[in-house]
C-alpha cells in the first residue's frame, strides 16, 4: 500500500500488514488499558494475564517499528494502570506503570525516547481519596493524568524540498 500525505487508521495489527516497510512518518496510539477496562470485542488485554498483554503489545510495537521510516516517531499515550486489590497480589489496590515494559521493548529495538508530555485530567477527575471517614488509613491516589511518550526510530532526517516547506508554512494567525 503506497501512502503519501494521508491519515490512516487501523483498529488491528492484521490490517497494518498492508503497509510497506518504512512508509509511515508518525504513529499516534493509545493501547487498551489491559484488563482494567472492557472496550468490547476482541481487545488486547481483556482476559489476558499482564505478561500476555505485554506480549500482545510488543507484537503491535514490532509492526509499528517495521512501518516507521528512519527518524519516524511513535507517540504512545498511556496512563498508570490501577490494579484492583483482588488481582494485585498485595491485598490492596496498586498502580502498575506499563511504560516500564514498553520502554524496555523500545530500547531493545533501538528506538530512543525523544520527549514526554503529561496530560493533566485533574479538572475532570477527583485527585485523592483519603480512605473511609472518619479513619482515613490509606491515601489512594487517582490516576488523574496520562503520559504521552514519543519514541524515535534511529535514522537520518528525511530531506524535504524547500519549495514544499515554504508552501506549508503556517501564518502567524494559524499558529
Task: State what each model feature region is.
Residues 1-175:
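Core catalytic lobe of class I
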Amino acid at each position: 500500500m503506497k501512502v503519501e500525505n494521508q491519515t490512516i487508521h487501523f483498529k488491528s495489527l492484521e490490517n497494518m500488514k498492508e503497509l510497506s516497510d518504512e512508509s509511515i512518518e508518525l504513529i499516534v496510539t493509545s493501547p487498551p488499558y489491559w484488563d482494567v477496562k472492557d472496550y468490547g470485542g476482541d481487545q488486547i488485554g481483556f482476559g489476558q494475564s499482564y505478561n500476555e498483554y505485554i506480549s500482545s503489545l510488543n507484537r503491535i510495537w514490532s509492526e509499528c517499528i517495521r512501518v516507521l521510516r528512519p527518524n519516524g516517531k511513535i507517540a504512545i499515550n498511556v496512563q498508570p494502570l490501577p490494579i484492583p486489590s483482588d488481582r494485585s497480589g498485595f491485598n490492596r489496590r496498586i498502580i502498575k506503570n506499563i511504560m516500564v515494559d514498553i520502554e524496555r521493548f523500545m530500547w531493545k529495538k533501538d528506538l530512543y525516547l525523544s520527549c514526554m508530555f503529561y496530560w493533566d485530567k485533574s479538572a475532570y477527575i477527583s485527585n485523592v481519596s483519603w480512605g473511609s471517614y472518619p479513619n482515613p488509613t490509606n491515601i489512594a491516589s487517582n490516576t488523574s493524568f496520562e503520559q504521552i511518550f514519543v519514541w524515535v526510530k534511529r535514522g537520518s532526517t528525511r530531506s524535504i524540498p524547500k519549495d514544499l516547506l515554504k508552501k506549508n508554512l503556517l501564518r502567524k494567525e494559524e499558529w
